[in-house]
Design a protein with these regions (language model features):
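Long recognition/docking surfaces used for binding and targeting
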Residues: 1-67
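SAM-dependent methyltransferase catalytic region
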Residues: 41-42, 46, 50-51, 57, ...
Length: 176
């Protein structure tokens, strides 16, 4: 996945440059500590669910520290995974009870209008609300996400694509 996605390629290129810096030329202790913390935490993550949680936490922390006014204006907040799962499952139940359809059914389009880092869609794929045999059709045709914050938009793309790739494990890359 990371070799095919253009955003992932760009981010990895930047990270490679950071890795090559030696400690003498990199004297910002706060950034070094943050980077080392991220590196330590990410080394043990092997699932897309774990990556999603780390991405969300880092994104919110980064924005709240680097751009507090933007965070406040745009309402950038991390929604805990448990709340995301509750909302996704509740929506599916309401659709079944009130409209006799499920989120996985054909012609039921799913729109996340303020997707942030793509957690709602990633979790929708991970929690099997959409069964594996229906995921490819839904992914290619009926999942939609919008975001006005460019960094979040790129992260959402990576998050959703990597989640899909982990579930389907195809030999070829599928862009979201």
């Amino acid at each position: 996945f990371s070799k095919e996605n253009s955003i992932s390629i760009a981010i990895n290129s930047i990270l490679d440059k950071i890795y090559k810096l030696d400690d003498e030329s990199f004297n910002n202790q706060t950034l070094i500590k943050f980077y080392e913390s991220v590196k330590r935490r990410s080394e043990d993550i092997v699932t897309s669910q774990g990556r999603s949680a780390l991405i969300n936490e880092l994104y919110e922390r980064f924005f709240s520290k680097a751009f507090p006014l933007t965070t406040s204006k745009l309402g950038i907040v991390y929604t805990p995974i448990e709340i995301v799962d509750f909302i996704n499952h509740s929506t599916n139940e309401i659709l079944k009870d009130e409209f006799n359809v499920k989120l996985e059914d054909k012609n039921v389009h799913i729109l996340d209008p303020f997707t942030g880092t793509g957690t709602f869609i990633a979790r929708l794929l991970q929690t099997e609300i959409i069964r594996k045999e229906n995921i490819t059709y839904k992914y290619k045709n009926e999942l939609h996400a919008n975001e006005i914050v460019l960094l979040a938009y790129y992260i959402a793309g990576i998050n959703i694509e990597s989640t899909y790739q982990d579930i389907i494990k195809p030999n070829n890359y599928e862009k979201f």
